[in-house]
Amino acid sequence: MPLDGVKNIVLVLSGKGGVGKSSVTLQLALALTLQGKSVGILDIDLTGPSIPRLVGLEDAKITQSPAGWVPVPVHSATDNATGPATGSLRCISLGFLLRDRGDAVIWRGPKKTAMIRQFLSDVSWGETDYLLVDTPPGTSDEHIALAEQLLTTATTDAAAAAAGGRPRLAGAVLVTTPQAIATSDVRKEVNFCVKTRIPTLGVIENMSGYACPCCGEVSNIFSSGGGRAMAQEMGIKFLGVVPVDVKFGELVEGGKIQDGSDSEDEGETARQEPEPEAVDDRPLVERYKDCWSYPRFEEFARTLIADIDGA
């Protein structure tokens, strides 16, 4: 059965490119994992897959099992005796199937549609509480194929999903930046959800301000509040704002997260030999908790869990 073992499916959508859908998808996944949920990420941005890079596994490859394709593991579930348990995190992306990470994907619509259908039917996810689907911008062939396939194999009705053992298409999280050019395109994505009868779970206003890496204070460099205003106007739940987080950027780029502290005597520091940086070998899930944006996504994750599981 397609998506066997998957309980809830959440789409991450935006009508505009460059608003941070992939980073929002990953941070939601990490936050849900830290809530003890088993999470999968399905990256259907076929021409620009970002998830392999964000999780630091660009050289990983998808393996085959009798049950189907096996997702690439990012984090294994843990049962901590001294702290809260964490769930597992796995992901699937076309980036894991490319011969070389620099290969361009130049496909027409029918081939994209076939690939998405294969992702939704041939992957052995196992027991997965939440499957987050990272989508490309706009409403293209990928979105149409995704909606058609999910509305056939899954259901938006919680009672029907529980009774029939089918996955539940819980809804879509819409991502925008504060600027009007982004919110105007997200309105089209809302219209897409209405026409396809996919519920909307809420709006996240990403890149809303800049979080200082030293103290965490948020400064509104550009405009702010556009996502909230759009959500209120369209009657959609507003989940919250996320500022630009330098620490998260350092995390996904493979660098060490800096604590933001500087030496009082710069001249003395310049004369000293630099000490080798200690390698932080903690799992990605644990390192993410050091990011300024984590408390915000922790709140988003709890809200989604309450809205979806409580429905």
UniProtKB/Swiss-Prot annotation:
It is found in: Cytoplasm. Signal peptide: none annotated. GO terms for biological process: iron-sulfur cluster assembly; tRNA wobble uridine modification. Keywords: 4Fe-4S, ATP-binding, Cytoplasm, Iron, Iron-sulfur, Metal-binding, Nucleotide-binding. It comes from the Eukaryota. CDD domains: Mrp_NBP35. Residues 255-281 are annotated as: Disordered. Gene3D superfamilies: P-loop containing nucleotide triphosphate hydrolases (3.40.50.300). It holds the Pfam family ParA. [4Fe-4S] cluster binds at C212, C215. ATP binds at G15, K16, G17, G18, V19, G20, K21, S22. The keyword Transmembrane does not apply. Binds 4 [4Fe-4S] clusters per heterotetramer. Contains two stable clusters in the N-termini of nbp35 and two labile, bridging clusters between subunits of the nbp35-cfd1 heterotetramer. One of its GO terms (molecular function) is ATP binding. GO terms for cellular component: cytosolic [4Fe-4S] assembly scaffold complex. InterPro entries: Mrp/NBP35_ATP-bd, NUBP2/Cfd1_eukaryotes, P-loop_NTPase, YlxH/NBP35. Its cofactor is [4Fe-4S] cluster. The keyword Metal-binding applies. Residues 268-281 have a biased composition (Basic and acidic residues). Heterotetramer of 2 nbp35 and 2 cfd1 chains. Belongs to the Mrp/NBP35 ATP-binding proteins family. NUBP2/CFD1 subfamily. PANTHER family: CYTOSOLIC FE-S CLUSTER ASSEMBLY FACTOR NUBP2, NUCLEOTIDE-BINDING PROTEIN NBP35 YEAST -RELATED. Component of the cytosolic iron-sulfur (Fe/S) protein assembly (CIA) machinery. Required for maturation of extramitochondrial Fe-S proteins. The nbp35-cfd1 heterotetramer forms a Fe-S scaffold complex, mediating the de novo assembly of an Fe-S cluster and its transfer to target apoproteins. This is Cytosolic Fe-S cluster assembly factor cfd1. It comes from Aspergillus terreus (strain NIH 2624 / FGSC A1156).
